[in-house]
Amino acid sequence: MAARGRRAWLSVLLGLVLGFVLASRLVLPRASELKRAGPRRRASPEGCRSGQAAASQAGGARGDARGAQLWPPGSDPDGGPRDRNFLFVGVMTAQKYLQTRAVAAYRTWSKTIPGKVQFFSSEGSDTSVPIPVVPLRGVDDSYPPQKKSFMMLKYMHDHYLDKYEWFMRADDDVYIKGDRLENFLRSLNSSEPLFLGQTGLGTTEEMGKLALEPGENFCMGGPGVIMSREVLRRMVPHIGKCLREMYTTHEDVEVGRCVRRFAGVQCVWSYEMQQLFYENYEQNKKGYIRDLHNSKIHQAITLHPNKNPPYQYRLHSYMLSRKISELRHRTIQLHREIVLMSKYSNTEIHKEDLQLGIPPSFMRFQPRQREEILEWEFLTGKYLYSAVDGQPPRRGMDSAQREALDDIVMQVMEMINANAKTRGRIIDFKEIQYGYRRVNPMYGAEYILDLLLLYKKHKGKKMTVPVRRHAYLQQTFSKIQFVEHEELDAQELAKRINQESGSLSFLSNSLKKLVPFQLPGSKSEHKEPKDKKINILIPLSGRFDMFVRFMGNFEKTCLIPNQNVKLVVLLFNSDSNPDKAKQVELMRDYRIKYPKADMQILPVSGEFSRALALEVGSSQFNNESLLFFCDVDLVFTTEFLQRCRANTVLGQQIYFPIIFSQYDPKIVYSGKVPSDNHFAFTQKTGFWRNYGFGITCIYKGDLVRVGGFDVSIQGWGLEDVDLFNKVVQAGLKTFRSQEVGVVHVHHPVFCDPNLDPKQYKMCLGSKASTYGSTQQLAEMWLEKNDPSYSKSSNNNGSVRTA
């Protein structure tokens, strides 16, 4: 027996040693490899700020600092090598714009140029800024910048004439798509004298005052001017004469006159140039391009003006998002090609290829029972009509859906007009007559749109005819991608695991070198939770049975797992609360059972008012405290507490979860024993409170910033809608999502007729919504009133639980 016991202990010890060695060889090297791969960007609500911060840490062309790069120098974003001696771009700027517009241009579009970008400013300009600045001798920042423009062209000629094929004069408030510009210029012969840009003749008021002969023009300077090497070679030797013989104060007019006079060419007469070199002609000129979801923005090579740097970054971010969309679409096409070729090659299709490569069809998802059928929503240009439980029958089109429709229509029109030139016609979008939409969670969004279009024929017999067409569209979901919220540090990971565990005192020191992890032991110390403390505020008056259930859930969710929370019960002392003594006694029992738990009762005087209670409770905390406004008829999980922390950002974002509300169990289960599981989510058991805002995670500082609760609101309702409106008006972000970790447990609803009429109406509406689903109520009515109705045809489906 002793030998057998020793063998058993040796087997256990050998298993432990082998397990630790394998963990050391496999887990930690992988973690170290991830660390060496470089830090990953955080997927936080401050995504845009993080990107700007990263950009602000990047330097320029002088010293060791370099600008923020979207891809390595000398490489194409599509993966191929780039010719870095193709295009030279000279950007005209001024000393006062070096730190703003010039830096924004350098950190955004300049990295896409297949060549060199330099910024030209006045003599004596600050060259310590993180961009390549050229101070032009004898030039100041006076406006109009005629001398600056000519001297910049001379600098290009003297230093780079034989090094680049094309030369561009640009403003510091322009945005240039380097890849599209390269494709356009490579279709032309740079050996010929070519002068490119948006053709200009002057404004209506300037007609006849620019010294232009009939048939003469100039290239407008705002969207950018491009000239071939031959034009620069012919013109620059005569710049002195051009400067002495100027007829207007317009710099671009005089450059065009000089080119026409000495290079023998002028700005190309082409309607297409107006689209490629885009100038924003809005009546209320604000100095930036506001509407980005526009086909003109997509077709253009240059965009002007964007005088405010934040709008330059906004435009650049949008262009990158379009690039990402194109790449995702390309991956979907490749998956479809893989599926197609696998049929011919008789090879096995991977699950991912089968999921993403399925051909477009409205029948990709095959429902097996009635409850699984995906219903369509009807839409017009302004409204969305829905039969989904919990949604109003008609609601206004929200901004996100309207933007999605605009983007879809824009893509459809681009596809329709792809070969408009060869066909001699162009089709313009007029409006959406009506349509249908639905979202298939497995595959993507689906649309059927009835479009009113204008058919314009410009070849042969010209004509304009209104036409209607049906468009059947699918936006396929691409592959799911996960991003680390934080970078993985192998040493920190091992340190944290060791701190939370005991030591391997029964192993030798040599073994500890191979095994950086430790097993739990008797010496482990109690660690205080590092999660942000959540202060749970519950207004309470009566409802003792609900309070007992709430405290049972609170014990299981927070007290036993030692969650970092504080419970504040806001107890009303009015005579209408007969359960006050029992509630105080229950809290005393829990404090005795859990002496280290942070729980308190805060008395509130007067008649019940949720707004007053939460205002009194929140006043006990500082501005950095995280508050959770809760109700006694809720149950929640530990996972929700983590989402409450993650989705609430001080000074930026408030979390308004959309909670699940149970229907009346007597109706749901038809007299049978109700399920004890509150977290059963089906159309039969409950509905999502899309228009309820009472459950909130918010920092005290943000509550103060928006103005707090309206304590004049008495009784039931309205205080949550009022707070939500204040948050929106204060400019803070609201994060809303279905929250599977919070459930409103059904209870009978009593609506006091003495309430304010608006509150009373809302209460009655809420009460009516809690009886049961529309389908089940209809079935109950049919059972009683229609003898021919057979419930056997109805399949209730399976209950999905969380």
UniProtKB/Swiss-Prot annotation:
Region feature (Disordered): 34-82
Residues where a divalent metal cation binds: D633, H747
Topology versus the membrane: Single-pass type II membrane protein
Gene3D superfamilies: 3.90.550.50, Spore Coat Polysaccharide Biosynthesis Protein SpsA, Chain A (3.90.550.10)
Catalytic activity: 3-O-(beta-D-GlcA-(1->3)-beta-D-GalNAc-(1->4)-beta-D-GlcA-(1->3)-beta-D-Gal-(1->3)-beta-D-Gal-(1->4)-beta-D-Xyl)-L-seryl-[protein] + UDP-N-acetyl-alpha-D-galactosamine = 3-O-(beta-D-GalNAc-(1->4)-beta-D-GlcA-(1->3)-beta-D-GalNAc-(1->4)-beta-D-GlcA-(1->3)-beta-D-Gal-(1->3)-beta-D-Gal-(1->4)-beta-D-Xyl)-L-seryl-[protein] + UDP + H(+); 3-O-{beta-D-GlcA-(1->3)-[beta-D-GalNAc-(1->4)-beta-D-GlcA-(1->3)](n)-beta-D-GalNAc-(1->4)-beta-D-GlcA-(1->3)-beta-D-Gal-(1->3)-beta-D-Gal-(1->4)-beta-D-Xyl}-L-seryl-[protein] + UDP-N-acetyl-alpha-D-galactosamine = 3-O-{[beta-D-GalNAc-(1->4)-beta-D-GlcA-(1->3)](n+1)-beta-D-GalNAc-(1->4)-beta-D-GlcA-(1->3)-beta-D-Gal-(1->3)-beta-D-Gal-(1->4)-beta-D-Xyl}-L-seryl-[protein] + UDP + H(+); 3-O-(beta-D-GalNAc-(1->4)-beta-D-GlcA-(1->3)-beta-D-Gal-(1->3)-beta-D-Gal-(1->4)-beta-D-Xyl)-L-seryl-[protein] + UDP-alpha-D-glucuronate = 3-O-(beta-D-GlcA-(1->3)-beta-D-GalNAc-(1->4)-beta-D-GlcA-(1->3)-beta-D-Gal-(1->3)-beta-D-Gal-(1->4)-beta-D-Xyl)-L-seryl-[protein] + UDP + H(+); 3-O-{[beta-D-GalNAc-(1->4)-beta-D-GlcA-(1->3)](n)-beta-D-GalNAc-(1->4)-beta-D-GlcA-(1->3)-beta-D-Gal-(1->3)-beta-D-Gal-(1->4)-beta-D-Xyl}-L-seryl-[protein] + UDP-alpha-D-glucuronate = 3-O-{beta-D-GlcA-(1->3)-[beta-D-GalNAc-(1->4)-beta-D-GlcA-(1->3)](n)-beta-D-GalNAc-(1->4)-beta-D-GlcA-(1->3)-beta-D-Gal-(1->3)-beta-D-Gal-(1->4)-beta-D-Xyl}-L-seryl-[protein] + UDP + H(+)
Pfam families associated with the record: CHGN
Enzyme Commission numbers on file: 2.4.1.175, 2.4.1.226
Disease linkage: Temtamy preaxial brachydactyly syndrome: A syndrome characterized by multiple congenital anomalies, intellectual disability, sensorineural deafness, talon cusps of upper central incisors, growth retardation, and bilateral symmetric digital anomalies mainly in the form of preaxial brachydactyly and hyperphalangism.
Protein name, entry field: Chondroitin sulfate synthase 1
Taxonomy of the source species: Eukaryota, Metazoa, Chordata, Craniata, Vertebrata
